[in-house]
């Protein structure tokens, strides 16, 4: 049985990925930070999967927690086939670089880039022994080309660095049957993070995307599930955008 480790997998986009992988028969270790209610809701939604589901509390900005999460996954299920780096802090306040505090800057880098480095270091040796692995990171529209993103300098810098790291790992680990790809969700907000595509289509015309509907957690989960398949090994080192045609990073740009 293939096993997935997903950070922040109990709610939002992560929950939809967790549910999709469970539906495919995989076992999943779900990391969460502190929301026990979200864990309870996910357990209630998947009563027949509890023998394939493990929850591990931890803060992805802390190296010791990341190592403990990876160890828990390996100890319980004996392998880690898929590493889904879903967690990543984000500052919603819109402000320019000069207005960031040091803590905010380093928090963005630690949570969105260094955390992934530590998980890579822990999980890649396991995948090498298996001669199989699928690594997924998250980015934003245009991350592969290092665009400027007004009022999102710290987050943008971390994710652009992560795009390069993802592509590098794809090259370095290809000989071991390991692929690495970045998925870039569009403007998926609120309850749409846990929504289905069908639910989004019921709201066609109410969204500002060119396709007429919002992106959903299911959109992202379907892409990730495909990338995790054994026969998806030809797809590696890619940055895949799922935006519905919306120009996400420039929609609020005025200067």
Curated annotation (Swiss-Prot):
The family this protein is said to belong to: Belongs to the short-chain dehydrogenases/reductases (SDR) family.
EC number: 1.-.-.-
Protein name, per record: Putative oxidoreductase YtkK
CDD domains xrefs: SDR_c
Assigned keywords, A-Z: Oxidoreductase
GO process terms (BP): fatty acid elongation
Name of the top EC class for this enzyme: oxidoreductase
GO molecular function: oxidoreductase activity, acting on the CH-OH group of donors, NAD or NADP as acceptor
Organism expressing this protein natively: Bacillus subtilis (strain 168)
Binding positions for NAD(+) per the UniProt entry: 7-14
One Pfam family hit: adh_short_C2
PANTHER family xrefs: 3-OXOACYL-(ACYL-CARRIER-PROTEIN) REDUCTASE, 3-OXOACYL-[ACYL-CARRIER-PROTEIN] REDUCTASE FABG
InterPro entries registered for this protein in UniProt: NAD(P)-bd_dom_sf, SDR, SDR_fam
Residues annotated as signal peptide: none
């Amino acid at each position: 049985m293939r096993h997935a480790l997903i950070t922040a997998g109990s709610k939002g986009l992560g929950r939809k990925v967790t549910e999709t992988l469970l539906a495919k028969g995989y076992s999943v270790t779900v990391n969460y930070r502190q929301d026990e209610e979200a864990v309870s809701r996910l357990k209630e939604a998947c009563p027949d999967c509890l023998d394939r589901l493990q929850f591990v509390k931890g803060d992805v900005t802390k190296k010791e927690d990341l190592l403990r999460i990876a160890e828990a996954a390996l100890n319980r299920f004996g392998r880690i086939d898929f590493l889904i780096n879903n967690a990543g802090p984000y500052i919603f306040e819109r402000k320019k670089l000069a207005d960031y505090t040091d803590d905010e800057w380093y928090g963005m880098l630690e949570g969105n880039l260094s955390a992934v480095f530590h998980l890579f270091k822990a999980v890649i040796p396991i995948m090498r022994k298996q001669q199989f692995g699928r690594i997924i990171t998250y980015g934003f529209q245009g991350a592969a080309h290092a665009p400027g993103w007004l009022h999102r300098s710290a987050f943008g810098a971390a994710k652009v660095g992560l795009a390069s790291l993802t592509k590098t790992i794809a090259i370095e680990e290809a000989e071991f049957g390991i692929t690495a790809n970045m998925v870039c969700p569009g403007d998926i907000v609120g309850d749409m993070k846990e929504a289905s595509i069908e639910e989004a289509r019921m709201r066609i015309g109410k969204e500002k995307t060119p396709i007429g509907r919002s992106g959903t957690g299911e959109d992202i989960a379907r892409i990730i599930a495909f990338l995790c398949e054994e026969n998806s090994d030809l797809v590696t080192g890619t940055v895949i955008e799922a935006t519905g045609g919306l120009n996400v990073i420039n929609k609020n740009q005025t200067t």
